[in-house]
């Protein structure tokens, strides 16, 4: 999903989760959501001291890779001008694993320039308002309407 390190990223994450809960073509209960699968349920947004804990970091990293490998779709919530390096790595990894990569951009930011590499791995880029009705049973390719940098 998204980074959740800034207010804008956190709002986008919450909006995406709300839209996914409303989408009848996705089984969110059995989907891998990184923030809901932190090692030992330790959330570093609540306990930043664990960012220095190698065990937590390695287990969380490996858990996210397992989540990508065992999922059909990689959905990345992308906030232009606030790119999350971790999301970029996960997008590339998902593509290398043959996963369908869907980027979701908040409506008010849709059309802004996005990173060329994130654009390149995406099979489709949609507005947040389209996520609740996106048909995950019929994924399609489409171009992003905005520019790249």
From Swiss-Prot:
InterPro entries: Nucleoside_deoxyribTrfase. The active site is at residue 90. GO terms for molecular function: nucleoside deoxyribosyltransferase activity. The keyword Endoplasmic reticulum does not apply. Its EC number is 2.4.2.6. It comes from the Bacteria. Keywords: Nucleotide metabolism, Transferase. The keyword Protein transport does not apply. GO terms for biological process: nucleotide salvage. It catalyses: 2-deoxy-D-ribosyl-base(1) + base(2) = 2-deoxy-D-ribosyl-base(2) + base(1). It is an enzyme of class 2 (transferase). Pathway: Nucleotide metabolism; nucleotide salvage pathway. Belongs to the nucleoside deoxyribosyltransferase family. Catalyzes the cleavage of the glycosidic bond of 2'-deoxyribonucleosides and the transfer of the deoxyribosyl moiety to an acceptor purine or pyrimidine base. This is Nucleoside deoxyribosyltransferase. The lineage of its organism: Bacteria, Bacillati, Bacillota, Bacilli, Lactobacillales.
